[in-house]
Regions:
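Conserved small/polar residues in nucleotide/adenosyl-binding loops
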Residues: 1-2, 267-274
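Contiguous, non-catalytic segments that form substrate-binding/exosite surfaces or channel walls
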Residues: 4-151
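Conserved helix-loop functional segments at active or binding sites
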Residues: 109-116, 142, 172, 176-183, ...
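Short pre-active-site segment immediately N-terminal to the catalytic Zn-binding motif
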Residues: 153-166
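Catalytic glutamate of the conserved HExxH
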Residues: 165, 169, 173
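Post-HExxH zinc-binding segment in Zn-dependent metallohydrolases
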Residues: 191-215
Length: 274
């Protein structure tokens, strides 16, 4: 990657300049305006969220990273250790049928209707969960048209995190089924709303798993996984947002060198900078 940093710098410079030109043509007042419009959110709301998350870096993400480094026996936790499993994590796997029952029962405790909608994804084969050669990594829920059901894709390996992923994507799926009732023009939703539905479904399942934990060790692993999930969902995204804001502001002053781009990323990192 180091050998290609000039290429990466050229890509960043080109994309940032291309956006600046389009924003100027569209009379966008800031580089962020277009994204705020597509997300149906006011700039003031985003800024308030950003400030609250950044203010919480030391007492949340920094504190957790220090704890995890201690648990892993590390003096300094590197970025590749961020999502590493804890040494006390159980190797026991959760089979697909058990995962289905966990998610559906968690949904049913909140809303039987929500569980019934989610159940269709299993009974009608709307989910592709098996790991297969050539299959794309990751997970997503994808609507098609309002007259056809959505699909869920994930790679289920049987870990508790995979159960959380299933619950997350089914949250999207249930939302997409219900949104289809609004018709083709109104069923599409911005990310801000879509992720609210998915994280809500995930939290329902997490609370059920936590309540069912039999040992302090099991609770610790679940809670650590949830903290890491929230750091990935919220803290990391704010760091990306800050990096992009700083990058576009710097690019407006002229072409950037690899070192200048690296400095933008280092400055906005949510990790401690002692």
């Amino acid at each position: 990657m180091y050998k290609r940093q000039s290429l990466f710098a050229r890509v960043h410079n080109t994309l940032a300049k291309d956006k600046e030109i389009e924003d100027r043509w569209r009379k966008m007042p800031t580089p962020q305006t277009g994204r705020h419009l597509s997300n149906h959110v006011e700039a003031e709301v985003v800024e308030a969220l950003r400030n609250a998350v950044v203010a919480a870096y030391p007492k949340l993400s920094h504190r957790y990273c220090a704890l995890k480094a201690k648990w892993l026996g590390l003096e300094t936790m590197q970025i590749w250790d961020r999502n590493a499993p804890l040494p006390i994590e159980d190797d026991k796997l959760i089979d697909w049928t058990a995962a289905q029952e966990m998610v559906l029962s968690a949904y049913a405790e909140f809303s039987p209707e929500m569980a019934e909608i989610a159940k269709q994804f299993f009974t009608k084969s709307w989910i592709d969960a098996a790991v297969k050669p050539g299959k794309a990594p990751g997970a997503f829920a994808h609507p098609t048209v309002t007259t056809v059901h959505p699909y869920v894709m994930l790679n289920y390996l049987g870990k508790p995190r995979d159960v959380m992923t299933l619950a997350h994507e089914l949250g999207h799926g249930v939302h997409q089924v219900l949104a289809a009732q609004q018709g083709e023009l109104l069923s599409s939703t911005p990310l801000t709303l879509a992720e609210t539905a998915s994280v809500f479904g995930e939290m329902l399942t997490f609370r059920k798993l936590l309540a069912a934990a039999k040992t302090p060790q099991e609770r610790k692993v679940l809670l650590a996984g949830k903290v890491e999930s929230m750091i990935n969902t919220v803290v990391r995204q704010i760091a990306f947002y800050d990096f992009e804001c700083k990058l576009h502001a710097a690019r407006a002053e002229g072409e950037l060198t690899p070192d200048q781009i690296n400095a933008c990323l280092l400055y906005t990192s949510p990790s401690p900078r002692d």
